[in-house]
Amino acid sequence: ALSVLLQXSCTMCLFCCYL
């Protein structure tokens, strides 16, 4: 998922840190 790339970067991807 994108969370793997953004490492939970809520600033760029608000939902990624929850995936």
From Swiss-Prot:
One annotated GO molecular function: toxin activity
Chief localization: secreted
PTM comment text: Contains 2 disulfide bonds.
KW Ribosomal protein (keyword) present: no
Subcellular localization, as worded in the UniProt entry: Secreted
Keywords from the UniProt entry: Disulfide bond, Secreted, Toxin
Cellular component, GO annotation: extracellular region
Disulphide-bonded residues: none
Tissue specificity note: Expressed by the venom duct.
Entry remark concerning the domains of this protein: The cysteine framework is XVI (C-C-CC).
Designated name of the protein: Augerpeptide hhe9
